[in-house]
A protein has these predicted regions:
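Catalytic histidine site
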Residues: 1-45
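Short, solvent-exposed secondary-structure boundary/capping segments
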Residues: 10-12, 79-86, 142-152
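Short, surface-exposed secondary-structure boundary micro-motifs
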Residues: 19-21, 122, 168, 181
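Serine endopeptidase catalytic core focused on the charge-relay Asp
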Residues: 24, 41-140
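C-terminal cap/linker of serine protease catalytic domains
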Residues: 26-63, 95, 175-244
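Active-site region of chymotrypsin-like
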Residues: 90-102, 127-211
Length: 244
């Protein structure tokens, strides 16, 4: 889901949020020999990923799609992590046609069970499919992380897409989370997907992940890209021992 696409210093910055398990094959940890430490160390290798954009007539009829290269700029693994990834699109000349409106962080308390929700994703590899439901549960924890549940039907392929909620006050659909998991019912040697019990990463966690990785400019116009880049660079600098 495109969450930011703006021009800064003659260069367009477009960012996409997805699940880590969607792009996990492009994240590799390899053992490399370190000539200074005289031992093998883990080295991260991030392959290029592709983001597919769709074109529509009258907002509803798919007339084509195109893929654009992107870089993985932040992530949290699915195993024991938060199953989240942030991508930066390499096209630095063209803004994205559509950018999701993020649900305001200071309005989270006004999200309730029975609120209508809408899931959008590439269900079973299909071009984006929309489904309608409601927020049905807001207190589940998986691997110690909070998930919300929606009855908007989702299936394999929805991961990394979006869940939206209509804001009556702001008169727009707003991004409230990332479809990430679906419930399954074991049936002998197989399992049935319970499509109306889909778990999604709630928007409050999305905000926290962006903050932890210093990408606050995506949701807060008072914070600049330059400030975030400086903070991220400082965080990545090797820490000096206090005794030095």
């Amino acid at each position: 889901t495109v969450v930011y696409s703006e021009k800064h210093k003659d260069e367009v910055h477009t960012y996409v949020i997805t699940n880590h398990h969607v792009i996990s094959d492009s994240v590799k940890i390899e053992k490399k020999w370190d000539s200074v430490l005289k031992r093998k160390v883990d080295k991260e290798k991030l392959d290029t990923v592709f983001v597919e954009f769709f074109r529509y007539n009258n907002y509803s009829h798919t007339v084509g799609s195109f893929a654009v290269e992107a870089d993985i700029v932040a992530y949290s693994e699915v195993e024991g992590g938060q199953d989240w990834a942030l991508l930066r699109v390499r096209d630095k000349e063209n803004k994205a046609d559509w950018v999701a409106n993020m649900f305001p962080l200071d309005d989270i308390e006004n999200v309730h069970i029975f609120d209508k929700s809408y899931a959008v994703g590439a269900s079973l590899g299909h071009p984006p499919v929309a489904s309608e439901g409601m927020i049905t549960y807001m207190d589940d924890e998986i691997d110690s992380y909070k998930y919300w549940m929606s009855s908007a039907p989702t299936i394999f392929g929805n991961s990394g897409g979006a869940v939206y909620r209509w804001s009556i006050a702001r008169k727009r659909y707003e991004y409230i989370g990332i479809p990430s998991r679906i419930s399954i019912q074991p049936m002998g040697f197989s399992a049935d997907a319970i499509t109306h019990m889909g778990y999604f990463i709630p928007i409050e966690r999305v905000y926290k992940l962006l903050e932890e990785n210093n990408y606050q400019f995506i949701y807060d116009e008072k914070i600049s890209i330059d400030d975030c880049n400086k903070a991220r660079k400082k965080k990545q600098e090797p820490k000096k021992d206090e005794d030095e």
